[in-house]
Design a protein with these regions (language model features):
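Boundary at the C-terminal end of the N-terminal hydrophobic targeting segment
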Residues: 17-19
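Electrostatic cytochrome c docking/interface patches
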Residues: 22-60, 131, 138-139
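Extracytoplasmic electron-transfer domains, predominantly the class I c-type cytochrome c fold
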Residues: 27-31, 76-124, 374
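Blade/loop signatures of beta-propeller domains
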Residues: 33, 133-179, 337, 342
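The canonical Cys-X-X-Cys-His
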Residues: 57, 61-72, 90, 114, ...
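Short, solvent-exposed loop/turn elements at domain surfaces
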Residues: 75-76, 157-163, 187-192, 211, ...
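Extracytoplasmic/lumenal domain signature
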Residues: 87, 170-185, 210-230, 235-282, ...
Length: 535
């Protein structure tokens, strides 16, 4: 009888773990006095030095730009994206780029006024032209015997650097000294993960420029101007270290307007450029992954921003994953996190049309499973009602066909956009959050007798998942998480220990004060999920 009882208990407990879909009830309290989001201007890193309402660029924008960039033309970037660009990028687009024909009738003064209006700055406050420190001829060469450092950025996303490769430990880290520094022109932030290869460092920037820097001196070997900010990391074709590659190596990256690029790593010459998604609010944030001459490109979106406006018809964006030929940019397959397009679902309290389900953006770099030939991604919240099973989920696709193998949702009923921040404006979904994305890439770990896929969520929870079928092996609540808290970007593992950084914040400008905050570094046993230590 005791054996039967133990068997039933274990069976029930196992089913509980495998059905780990938690409700959207979170540990927070509502603070009526907390600062809440007043406008989307707060999201832009800038100082406003004009009055947008009275500036002459306002009328010029409405007459020449608004018809496309206020959301009516699918392929045109929404104005909230244009606001994030630096003035030089906008001038580049109008004078030499895709908007040359549309801008031909405008005078130089009118172009300046439009740019002033879009970036909310007077021309005297525009960033000044920068002089780059280009390398002397002897430092312009690339060492082709030095292959890209394989630190787990593009396969199992382990982010683990072995001691014999990194050569930095607790004993010598205090001896590090600054050798050189490179200031990014026209930039207020740096978010692109650099790549080290061929005696050089390749890195993107807020201005949209890609730089190849000499690793010894920091001088510039070449630079390339993309259409917009490059937030993704840089990856490169791989080859065996110590020998020259069989072909000229390319580097790959994406910009915030959802373009993906391939450049010749030695010259910076553009090899190909593709638009990864036609939605005006699509973007590229996560680094692509390359495997067997195929580039896997995740697509995210920020339609949550225009949804703040009462007259915006929210929402139609869907997260996506593309497989393309690395040499040519030819799309082999594309899958959406939400398999079917959003449908009309009614009107808001002010009469604006609504669509859904939407969202489930892919913030995470794809995780390539070479043994199973699967590729894993994590999704964010839905943007509009109804919430479906695509949000806050880990999804496995077949590498060769793109067919979905399994999906595991760990938080049901999560639909959220900026209209929910404090005031609950008309476009806020019925679910009203809590916005608990998977924004950190999963990690595939070999435990010897089995593999485990580990995923961390903004909810502050970590899951150990069976990569064969998506069943949850263990789960651990590390903290209370939050809209801008929990596991945001990047866990790491040496195979036995999982390193979990937490970004818990008290006030996230949404009127909620999150409880059970544990910001810092936490470590878990990869086999059991037990917490080892926390700092």
């Amino acid at each position: 009888l005791m054996k039967i009882f133990i068997f039933i208990f274990c069976l029930l407990f196992s089913n509980f773990l495998n059905a780990e879909i938690i409700s959207n009830e979170q540990d927070y309290i509502i603070d009526e006095d907390a600062k809440v989001r007043e406008s989307t201007d707060e999201l832009i890193v800038r100082e406003i030095t004009i009055d947008p309402e009275t500036h002459p660029g306002n009328a010029l924008y409405q007459d020449n730009c608004a018809i496309c960039h206020d959301g009516s033309i699918q392929k045109a970037p929404a104005v909230n994206w244009l606001e994030m660009l630096i003035p030089q990028a906008l001038f580049r687009t109008m004078n030499d780029g895709i908007m040359v024909d549309q801008s031909a009738h405008l005078s130089e003064e009118e172009k300046i006024q439009i740019v002033e209006y879009i970036v909310r700055k007077d021309r005297k406050d525009f960033p000044k032209e920068a002089e780059l420190n280009y390398c002397e001829s002897k430092r312009m060469k690339f060492d082709l015997r030095e292959a890209p450092a394989p630190y787990g950025w593009g396969y199992n996303t382990s982010r683990f650097i072995p001691k014999n490769s990194g050569k930095i430990d607790s004993k010598n880290v205090k001896k590090l000294k600054l050798k050189w520094a490179f200031g990014f022109p026209y930039s207020q932030r740096a978010r692109s993960q650099p790549l080290f290869a061929m005696g050089s460092i390749f890195v993107g920037s807020q201005s949209g420029d890609i730089y190849a820097l000499d690793v010894e001196t920091g001088c510039v070997k070449w630079n390339f101007s993309a259409s917009a900010e490059v937030r993704t990391g840089i990856i490169m074709d791989e080859w065996k270290n110590g020998v020259k590659p069989k072909k000229r190596p390319y580097i790959y990256f994406g910009d915030i307007l959802a373009n993906e690029y391939a450049l010749d790593a030695q010259t910076g010459e553009l090899i190909w450029k593709i638009k990864t998604d036609d939605h005006p609010n699509a973007t590229r944030t996560a680094t692509s992954a390359k495997f067997e001459d195929i580039l896997f490109i995740p697509v995210s979106g920020l339609e949550v921003i225009p949804a703040f406006n009462d007259d915006y018809e929210c929402c139609t964006f869907r997260g996506g994953l593309l497989a393309v030929e690395a040499d040519t940019g030819k799309v082999l397959w594309k899958k959406y996190s939400i398999p079917v397009p959003a449908k009309y679902s009614g009107t808001t309290s002010v009469g604006t049309r609504m669509f859904g389900p939407s969202g489930a953006p892919i913030w995470t770099s794809p995780n390539v499973d070479k043994k199973r030939r699967y590729i894993y991604i994590g999704t964010g919240e839905n943007y509009s009602t109804p919430a479906d099973d695509s949000s806050d989920a880990i999804i496995a696709y077949n590498i060769d066909t793109g067919e979905e193998v399994w999906r595991r949702q760990t938080l049901a009923g999560d639909a959220w956009n900026l209209a929910c921040m404090g005031k609950a404006l008309p476009n806020c979904p019925e679910e009203n959050g809590p916005d608990m994305d998977y924004s950190a890439s999963s990690i595939l770990i070999d435990l010897g007798d089995k593999d485990i896929l580990v995923a961390g969520q903004k909810s502050g929870s970590v899951y150990g998942i069976n990569p064969d079928n998506g069943e949850i092996i263990w789960s651990k609540v590390v903290s209370g998480g939050g809209t801008q808290g929990g596991i945001h970007f990047g866990m790491a593992s040496d195979g036995k220990v999982l390193y979990v950084p937490l970004n818990d914040m008290k006030n996230t400008h949404d009127g909620k004060v999150w409880l059970n905050r544990k910001p810092g570094m936490h470590t878990l046993d990869t086999e059991t999920g037990n917490i080892l230590w926390s700092k």
